[in-house]
Amino acid sequence: TTINIMCGQLTKDSGRVFIDKYDLEEDMDYIKRELGVVFQSSVLDSALSVYDNLESRAALYGITGMAFKNRLEELAKKLDFKDLLKRTVGKLSGGQRRRIDIARALFHKPKILILDEPTTGLDPQTRQLIWTVISGFRKSEDMTVFLTTHYMEEAAEADYVVIIDDGKISAEGTPLELKNIYTGDYITIYGVEEKDIKALNIEYERIRNGYRLSVPNTKAATELIIRNPQLFDDYEITKGKMDDVFLAVTGKTLVGGAEK
């Protein structure tokens, strides 16, 4: 819903929407020129070739001739679809089609790239390629990425995260801020006996070759180690994950990118 409102496909019930300081109602034409959008469902024309889809899209922004060829070559190389240019979109796999969707959205060098669950259902290799390319363009073209996702490892890479549950904002902040508020730290310790771990009187779980201890924060972890130096010859401290944040905020878990 949020993305459809931002793109002008749905009318908001109330309030005002500003994108890059521009009012959505007053400056829609400008905003549309500055946005690149990858919807959850592909908007490519299945009857046309990859080349024709991208050529027609580029023409809407006045990108023709050598400018079109140069941008096409750049995107085809980075997103690895040069061999697909003559293929009909309807014959592409899901991962191939998603790469073309992203190329379509990036063609006019948008200031803001909107991604609506762009990697759902994709294999790990394609997901990694897509994020490598997007991260590269974000830096080289000074582009903002607005992402909706159920994959918390993707949210962990964001500069700012908003968790929405049942249509309302439940929590927001940087990944580090959210982890500090909603999760603790973990100490993974190796080469010790369970009786020594029990003597610490803190929550723990047995893992392969060691134990994982739960502590409120990094300060508590440091104090525990200082008090018991004889136990901590081989250990590591890690923060909770964004999955832990999501569970703490919403009471729900995410399995395979979907709520459960």
Give the location of each predicted region.
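Conserved ABC transporter NBD signature motif
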Residues: 15-23, 31
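Conserved ABC ATPase "signature" region
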Residues: 55, 59, 66-84
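Conserved ABC ATPase signature
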Residues: 88-92
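Conserved catalytic motifs of ABC-family nucleotide-binding domains
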Residues: 109
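Catalytic Walker B motif of ABC-type/P-loop ATPase nucleotide-binding domains
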Residues: 113-116
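Short, charged/small-residue-rich alpha-helical element at the C-terminal edge
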Residues: 183-253
